[in-house]
Amino acid sequence: MALKERLGTVVSDKMDKTVVVAVENRFPHPIYQKTVSRTTRYKAHDAGNTCRIGDRVRITETRPISRSKRWTVAEVLSHSPKAQEVST
């Protein structure tokens, strides 16, 4: 079985080794056919505490790590401009 992958934006990094990633899902409304966007928030494991708020990341499904974590950060696609300013 293939592992699920999602692309999203980090919206919280306050927890140790955990980030909250918001993934936007767009789909047509079944009756009115208007494009509807729904945001789902996933808690993902960030082993190195490398992600910051605003980063674009790819998360993959994994074994349950805790009660609410079933995803892990596979890679950071782009860092947010704010995170780059703070680190320099």
Swiss-Prot record:
Biological process terms in GO annotation: translation
NCBIfam families listed in its UniProt record: PRK05610.1, uS17_bact
One matching Pfam family: Ribosomal_S17
Example of a GO cellular component annotation carried by this entry: cytosolic small ribosomal subunit
Similarity annotation: Belongs to the universal ribosomal protein uS17 family.
Highest taxon listed in the record's lineage: Bacteria
Keywords associated with the record: Ribonucleoprotein, Ribosomal protein, RNA-binding, rRNA-binding
RNA-binding listed as a keyword: yes
Subunit structure of this chain's protein: Part of the 30S ribosomal subunit.
InterPro entries per the UniProt record, alphabetical: NA-bd_OB-fold, Ribosomal_uS17, Ribosomal_uS17_bact/chlr, Ribosomal_uS17_CS
Function description: One of the primary rRNA binding proteins, it binds specifically to the 5'-end of 16S ribosomal RNA.
Record-given protein name: Small ribosomal subunit protein uS17
Keyword check for Transmembrane helix: no
GO MF annotations in UniProt: rRNA binding; structural constituent of ribosome
